[in-house]
Amino acid sequence: MSSATSDRMTRQELRAGLSLASIFALRMLGLFLILPVFAVAAGKLPGGDNLTLVGIALGIYGLTQAALQLPFGMASDRYGRKRVIVIGLLIFAAGSFIAAAAPDIYWTIFGRALQGAGAISAAVTALAADLTREQHRTKVMALIGSSIGLMFALSLVAAPALNAVIGLSGIFILTGLLALVYFGSIVVLQQ
């Protein structure tokens, strides 16, 4: 292989990097999209006037995600990266749909906990490492990492507009549907 050829990412590496960055971005979108609107929108839910419960609903996502990163990472080593990512996306989607249909703040907390329980970050980055050559791994990891900042900025702008059009339940439904779309993209990646 010539030096010029090895200096460039292959089509498969680029596709894997973009797909995995998109999946990671979805997770960040699920976390960030409700932040600008949740405290106000939650006030319409029974129990949503309790600021402690609103804070728990916001924070439980990150708590369950952090608690389950290591177990999901170990499961991806044992059962395969794609399988764990698919399961995580399905758990995330289920949590999104439960939060969308939540009749009160307690069900919202449960839905958000499930969203966070689909802890796929470790499996996504491990799969990125598996699918790229060493000299291109940093580029793919940077692409995945940049999705965090991009989703945060996008969420701050899009969330109020989305909330005005589809409401908080619609935002949860949207993130659940996106998880199902990305479920398809992970299936087509090489392993």
Task: Name what the model sees in each region.
Residues 25, 95, 106-119:
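Hydrophobic core of transmembrane alpha-helices in multi-pass small-molecule transporters
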Residues 36-51:
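Short amphipathic helix-loop junctions that connect adjacent transmembrane helices
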Residues 39, 151-163:
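Small-residue (Gly/Pro/Ala) motifs that create kinks and tight helix-helix packing interfaces
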Residues 62-70, 152-153:
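Residue-level signature of mid-helix packing/kink "hotspots" within the transmembrane helices
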Residues 111-148:
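Cytoplasmic helix-loop-helix junction between adjacent transmembrane helices
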